UniProtKB/Swiss-Prot annotation:
One Gene Ontology CC term in the entry: cytoplasm
Official protein name in the record: Protein SprT-like
Natural source organism: Anoxybacillus flavithermus (strain DSM 21510 / WK1)
SMART domains: SprT (SM00731)
UniProt keyword annotation of Phosphoprotein present: no
Pfam families per the UniProt record, alphabetical: SprT-like
Keywords for this protein: Cytoplasm, Metal-binding, Zinc
InterPro entries: SprT-like_domain, Uncharacterised_SprT-like
Phylogenetic lineage: Bacteria, Bacillati, Bacillota, Bacilli, Bacillales
Cofactor details (free text): Binds 1 zinc ion.
Residues at the catalytic site: E68
Amino acid sequence: MDERELQALVERISLDVFHKPFRHRAVFNDRLRTTGGRYVLSTHHIELNRKYYEQYGEEELIQVIKHELCHYHLYLEGKGYRHRDRDFRELLQKVQAPRFCKPVLLSKTKKEHYYKCTSCRYMYVRRKALDTTRYVCGFCRGKLKKIKREC
């Protein structure tokens, strides 16, 4: 699904479900990691997570769009648009939109760097690489050497 199709889908859902037009932009935001989407108050745009669409499909994306459109329409009407507001919860029930979305499964590879002290043989395991010319062993002040993991 590209940006044009997404915009058309959001406009159609807004008219079919809420009977009100959506007059702003709906875009995919690849920086979203843990949420399905968000409504931006300052611009009134709706940003959606592309990974959420790829993981769960169009049906779940429609649910997220309905949720974000609840924020959108309530804010423009001057009603309570936050999750804790009664107006928001009532509109969610009326349009059968979820209050929270399914969690996005992150496929983050865990890379580790291994260093060994040349003097005391202490093994360091780190997530971030370090410059072995600037750092020394914390126990004996010996030099560190980057090694490959021993299985």
